């Protein structure tokens, strides 16, 4: 198959990199570099826009960045884009315990990609959101908070799924499909 485009995905997370490569398949050559980008406090959109702008300035060319979040309905969307910091502090079990006393364990998992052709160029955002439940940690395949998020309509957490299963239904998959469609339309 012909490669449509080479994309520099700026991330230090090897698991996210592997997921994106698996989801986008062989139509795109995904290259990677881990730059130390600012992680501002703000909405997911603000975080991704700032990361994409900073990465484009460093690279002086096209870049892709990503931010994920996990929001608990009982906590009005927290921890949201700060889930990484909560996870580093309390781990998956602590993330579950944060919501365990509430009646509802409903949550949303979200992923937002930011893509730009370079410094000063428009930044395009692609978001995927998936409804699910926060459950006690289960499974060992995956990373981050995968062991506590069970998508609605599924009997397994992300960490209990194979990479192929997770990458065919995840919040990252939904966002990556929008990104793929955009990139393919740009080539036509």
Curated annotation (Swiss-Prot):
| Sequence positions that bind Mg(2+) | 39
Tell me which Pfam families the record gives: Ham1p_like (PF01725)
Which compartments does it reside in?
A: Cytoplasm; Nucleus
Q: Cofactor(s) for this protein?
A: Mg(2+); Mn(2+)
Classification via SUPFAM superfamilies: ITPase-like
Signal sequence region: none
Its domain of life? Eukaryota
Subunit description: Homodimer.
The family this protein is said to belong to: Belongs to the HAM1 NTPase family.
Say what the protein does.
Pyrophosphatase that hydrolyzes non-canonical purine nucleotides such as inosine triphosphate (ITP), deoxyinosine triphosphate (dITP) or xanthosine 5'-triphosphate (XTP) to their respective monophosphate derivatives. The enzyme does not distinguish between the deoxy- and ribose forms. Probably excludes non-canonical purines from RNA and DNA precursor pools, thus preventing their incorporation into RNA and DNA and avoiding chromosomal lesions.
Q: What is this protein called?
A: Inosine triphosphate pyrophosphatase
Q: What species is given as this protein's source? A: Schizosaccharomyces pombe (strain 972 / ATCC 24843) (Fission yeast)
Task: Print the organism lineage.
Answer: Eukaryota, Fungi, Dikarya, Ascomycota, Taphrinomycotina
